[in-house]
């Protein structure tokens, strides 16, 4: 019977307002989450991989004459020509530079041609007409496990596809050289024959080996613990801000609190918006320290804290404070709508652009653009550097720190300016309906 007292016009707002808001928010959620996971290889762009050619070349006998060859250079040139430039950022570097790029999380993997590649390929050609077991020359496809398991799979598939074509080209060339050598056998002498097994080996002369560069230790979760740690920090900041905002407002009398069937609504406290925000910020800072310590304790118990627990704790506190204070400033500026804004910025847009599961180079370009400033990506880079790259400043920790400080600065300035402005304009936290009744 109580529902009959609600005016029909208000029923429209009760039913359609949440329907419209949720349709918009959840449609955005569907687009972001399904778009970033639907076709990673089709979305590839600027995916960085190193190509290292250490081959020093060799002198081989071809048709009765010696010839200086460098099969490694031929393979490298074929790989450069065969890689789609719009998808792969192939960096031709030396082994030292490749190691540096791996350490600083600048590349997802590397294709390494060893120094004795030409020599071993020449031995394989000679050995094809004599007895005995001969090993095929090796090219190594290295993956960077700290960049995540999905990126390792992409590197492996790219390397295998490229090397299949190169293997065929080198096999045809090597087979032709062996046949030319056999054709130069002196008249009257019996020319050696290439056995069927040797022909198969010559057709695919390169053995491609997949290998992890510096495998992660136990507790790394195949490179996913950094992502989940970053997710924990973001969720603690967003949920923590929401809980603190609600509970502090309840204690100050700005909104009621329900405990099961009990309903409590304290009288409003005469306090400005600015000072209310300062109280919430202070509580958030204290909570951030406590939660970060609890996270570290849980991580230590589960063995996923890595080798840099102090750095992990300090960065967690910084990131959590930055996220929490930003969410508080949003709630102070937009009120209840700030909850949806925080959800959109930190979760809906943040998780797909984090690169914690699918690399940003394997997502649509608009998601990669979001990663330039989305908070979760910055936190993930810092966590990844601490857990997998020995807190290397250039591996993402530096960016994570500076972007967290920038976010903190924006939150402080924005929160102070907007609450001061509301207070200056006399926009106090009071019930407008009651105010109109009193005025009447």
What label would you give each PLM region?
Residues 182-193, 264-268, 289-301:
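Hydrophobic, membrane-facing alpha-helical anchors
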Residues 228, 272, 277-440:
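Membrane-spanning alpha-helical segments of multipass transporters and channels
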Residues 236-289:
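Juxtamembrane interface at the cytosolic side of transmembrane helices
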Residues 233-241, 411-415:
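Hydrophobic core segments of alpha-helical transmembrane domains
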Residues 217-237:
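N-terminal membrane-entry
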Residues 28-29, 240, 294, 326:
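Hydrophobic/aromatic residues in alpha-helical transmembrane segments
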Residues 1-219, 425-440:
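Extracytoplasmic/periplasmic domains immediately adjacent to an N-terminal transmembrane anchor
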């Amino acid at each position: 019977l109580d529902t009959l007292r609600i005016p029909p016009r208000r029923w429209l707002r009760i039913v359609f307002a949440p329907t419209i808001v949720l349709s918009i928010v959840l449609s955005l959620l569907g687009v972001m989450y399904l778009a970033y996971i639907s076709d990673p290889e089709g979305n590839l762009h600027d995916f960085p991989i190193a190509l290292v050619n250490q081959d020093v070349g060799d002198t081989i006998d071809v048709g009765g004459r010696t010839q200086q060859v460098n099969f490694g250079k031929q393979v490298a040139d074929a790989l450069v020509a065969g890689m789609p430039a719009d998808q792969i950022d192939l960096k031709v570097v030396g082994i030292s530079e490749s190691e540096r790029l791996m350490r600083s999380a600048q590349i997802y993997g590397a294709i390494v041609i060893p120094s004795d590649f030409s020599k071993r390929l020449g031995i394989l050609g000679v050995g094809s007409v004599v007895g005995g077991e001969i090993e095929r020359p090796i090219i190594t496809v290295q993956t960077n496990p700290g960049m995540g398991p999905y990126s390792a799979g992409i590197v492996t598939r790219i390397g295998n596809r490229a090397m299949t074509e190169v293997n065929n080209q080198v096999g045809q060339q090597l087979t032709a050289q062996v046949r030319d050598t056999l054709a130069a056998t002196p008249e009257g002498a019996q020319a050696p024959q290439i056995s069927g097994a040797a022909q198969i080996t010559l057709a695919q002369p390169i053995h491609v080996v997949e290998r992890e560069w510096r495998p992660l230790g136990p507790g790394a979760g195949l490179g996913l613990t950094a992502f989940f740690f970053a997710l924990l920090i973001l969720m603690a900041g967003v949920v923590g801000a929401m809980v603190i905002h609600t509970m502090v407002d309840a204690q100050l009398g700005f909104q009621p609190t329900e405990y099961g069937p009990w309903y409590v609504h304290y009288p409003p406290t005469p306090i400005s918006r600015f000072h209310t925000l300062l109280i919430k910020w202070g509580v958030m800072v204290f909570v951030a320290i406590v939660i970060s310590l609890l996270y570290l304790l849980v991580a230590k118990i589960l063995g996923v804290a890595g080798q840099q627990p102090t750095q992990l704790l300090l960065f967690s506190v910084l990131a959590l404070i930055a996220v929490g204070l930003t969410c508080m400033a949003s709630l102070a500026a937009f009120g209840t709508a700030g909850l949806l804004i925080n959800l959109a910025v930190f979760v809906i847009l943040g998780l797909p652009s984090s690169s914690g599961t699918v690399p940003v180079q394997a997502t649509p370009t608009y998601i990669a653009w979001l990663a330039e400033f989305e908070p979760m990506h910055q936190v993930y880079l810092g966590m990844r550097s601490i857990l997998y790259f020995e807190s290397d400043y250039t591996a993402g920790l530096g960016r994570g720190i500076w972007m967290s400080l920038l976010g903190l600065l924006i939150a402080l300035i924005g929160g102070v300016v907007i609450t001061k402005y509301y207070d200056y304009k006399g926009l106090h936290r009071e019930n407008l309906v009651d105010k109109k009744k009193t005025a009447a």
